[in-house]
């Protein structure tokens, strides 16, 4: 009876069946390109997520100029809601990547950012939009704040220890640039 070895199973389109970034052969034969591509995608997404998360703080100061007549307290609540939502959703995001995978988390979180972005686009054009709708849109803007808790741990899994600091610095540094972008635009 002869023993035959099966060839290594190729990486699945959804799940990585083998991931060994510390193995130099694995890293140089495709692991590196997957890791850097994943870093690029999650960094762009994180930049957009931070922009969406802090968008409300940039919009609230302009709401009276477009016809909204909210009290200072109401405006502060609109500004606070994304932070409250983002902080709470970070607890959920901690478990998402290991449960459903980085690809699904990135896809779903990017799509979820469309709700506050499109919603606020239309809301600022119509001062008759009720306060509770703006409060809900502010909550959904907080979805971007939760992304940080999914992407940083995911990046930690993709890179060998010798490159981990560089990868995390790129992701956090460029990702946080989203805050500045939304304040300047």
Question: What do the predicted segments below correspond to?
Answer:
Residues 37-68, 182-185:
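Extracytoplasmic
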Residues 146-160:
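Intracellular juxtamembrane helix-capping segments at the cytosolic ends
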Residues 130-146:
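Hydrophobic core of transmembrane alpha-helices in multi-pass small-molecule transporters
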Residues 2-45, 49:
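Cytosolic juxtamembrane N-terminal segment immediately preceding the first transmembrane helix
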Residues 77-95:
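Central cavity-lining transmembrane alpha-helices of secondary-active solute carriers
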Residues 111-127:
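C-terminal ends and interior cores of transmembrane alpha-helices
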Residues 145, 165-185:
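Glycine-rich segments within core transmembrane alpha-helices of 12-TM secondary carriers
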């Amino acid at each position: 009876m002869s023993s035959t070895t099966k060839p290594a199973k190729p990486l699945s389109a959804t799940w990585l069946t083998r991931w060994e970034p510390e193995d130099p052969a694995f890293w140089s034969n495709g692991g590196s390109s997957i890791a850097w591509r994943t870093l690029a995608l999650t960094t762009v997404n994180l930049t957009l997520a931070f922009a969406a998360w802090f968008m409300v703080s940039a919009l609230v100061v302009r709401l009276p100029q477009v016809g909204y007549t909210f009290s200072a307290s109401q405006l502060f609540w609109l500004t606070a809601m994304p932070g409250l939502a983002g902080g709470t959703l970070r607890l959920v995001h901690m478990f998402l990547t290991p449960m459903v995978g980085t690809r699904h988390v990135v896809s779903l979180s990017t799509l979820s950012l469309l709700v506050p972005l499109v919603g606020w686009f239309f809301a600022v054009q119509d001062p008759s939009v009720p306060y509770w709708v703006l409060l809900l849109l502010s909550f959904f803007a907080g979805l971007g704040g939760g992304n940080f808790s999914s992407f940083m741990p995911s990046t930690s899994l993709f890179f060998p220890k010798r490159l981990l600091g560089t990868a995390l610095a790129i992701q956090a540094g460029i990702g946080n640039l989203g805050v500045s972008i939304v304040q300047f635009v």
